[in-house]
From Swiss-Prot:
The RRM domain is essential for specific adenine bases recognition in the poly(A) tail but not sufficient for poly(A) binding. This is Polyadenylate-binding protein 2. Residues 255-302 are annotated as: Strong poly(A) affinity and self-association. The modification Phosphoserine is found at residues 19, 52, 91, 146, 231. PANTHER family: EUKARYOTIC TRANSLATION INITIATION FACTOR 4B/4H (PTHR23236), POLYADENYLATE-BINDING PROTEIN 2 (PTHR23236:SF16). Residues 2-141 are annotated as: Interaction with SKIP. InterPro entries: Nucleotide-bd_a/b_plait_sf, RBD_domain_sf, RRM_dom. Residues 51-68 have a biased composition (Acidic residues). CDD domains: RRM_II_PABPN1. It comes from Mus musculus (Mouse). GO terms for cellular component: cytosol; nuclear inclusion body; nuclear speck; nucleus; ribonucleoprotein complex.
């Protein structure tokens, strides 16, 4: 027994040296009662010798292998922080907040077309206001523009100028209602150059009142035209007398004109004796105005 124990100790020492530090090997007696280290593959040795090992505590647990993290994609410069699903701490909260932020641009995209439509409408209104302003300015310019030379004179004439023009004018009475200014001008054509022919008409009916005024270029033509007094014009004997200027504040009814309002139809002639029709004019208080004006019954043609 002593020899067997010594052999086992020697074998253990030899096995310990060959197995590395901290490793112990024990030989268990075989079936024949002898302890020994034989070839496990030899015949008759199966189950005769069993080997047991005692491992150190450090060798019982395997060393953990370091886990390699998958490479993360690099974000381009200036890109925002990790988005949803990045796996970073607090990413769940960050995922919720960007979700709200992303919903705001959607609402803004819905409001943008409405805002653009409002701005477009405002621009259209401003353009319309500018056009209206331009039209108003144009109308004011046209209203402030001086009338043609043939009609402007009587409107801006002073009393002295009016008297001078009346001194070159005559009154023609008992004129046929169907007579025209051209026919009257032709009737007095031999007396001198005619500047203006005015046929007075009733304001309400528009029918001629049966008398007219003829303005010549010089006073000599007035004296010549008086020779046509009681001459026949369109089958009627007309009355030709010099025209008299009405002074402000003086009213005369000695000519027996009806107390009614009237308007005048005036035709002007320039120095070259070319004619043009100037429309209906009125002669309140001896003055000629453009358009349809009113005159009282105390008007005197002289």
């Amino acid at each position: 027994m002593a020899a067997a124990a010594a052999a086992a100790a020697a074998a253990g020492a030899a096995g310990g040296r060959g197995s590395g530090p901290g490793r112990r090997r024990h030989l268990v007696p075989g079936a024949g009662g002898e302890a020994g280290e034989g070839d496990p593959g030899g015949a008759g040795d199966y189950g005769n010798g069993l080997e047991s090992e005692e491992l150190e505590p450090g060798e019982l647990l395997p060393e953990p292998e370091p886990e390699e993290e998958p490479p993360r994609p690099r974000a381009p410069p200036g890109a925002p922080g990790p988005g949803p699903g990045s796996g970073a701490p607090g990413s769940q909260e960050e995922e919720e907040e960007p979700g709200l932020v992303e919903a705001d641009p959607g609402d803004g995209a819905i409001e943008d077309p409405e805002l653009e439509a409002i701005k477009a409408r405002v621009r259209e209104m401003e353009e319309e206001a500018e056009k209206l302003k331009e039209l108003q300015n144009e109308v004011e310019k046209q209203m402030n523009m001086s009338p043609p030379p043939g009609n402007a004179g009587p409107v801006i004439m002073s009393l002295e100028e009016k008297m001078e023009a009346d001194a070159r004018s005559i009154y023609v009475g008992n004129v046929d209602y169907g007579a025209t200014a051209e026919e009257l001008e032709a009737h007095f054509h031999g007396c001198g150059s005619v500047n203006r022919v005015t046929i007075l008409c009733d304001k309400f009916s528009g029918h001629p009142k049966g008398f007219a005024y003829i303005e010549f270029s010089d006073k000599e033509s007035v004296r010549t035209s008086l020779a046509l007094d009681e001459s026949l014009f369109r089958g009627r004997q007309i009355k030709v007398i010099p025209k008299r200027t009405n002074r402000p504040g003086i009213s005369t009814t000695d000519r027996g004109f009806p107390r009614s309002r009237y308007r005048a139809r005036t035709t002007n002639y320039n120095s070259s004796r070319s004619r043009f029709y100037s429309g209906f004019n009125s002669r309140p208080r001896g003055r000629i105005y453009r358009g349809r004006a009113r005159a009282t019954s105390w008007y005197s043609p002289y």
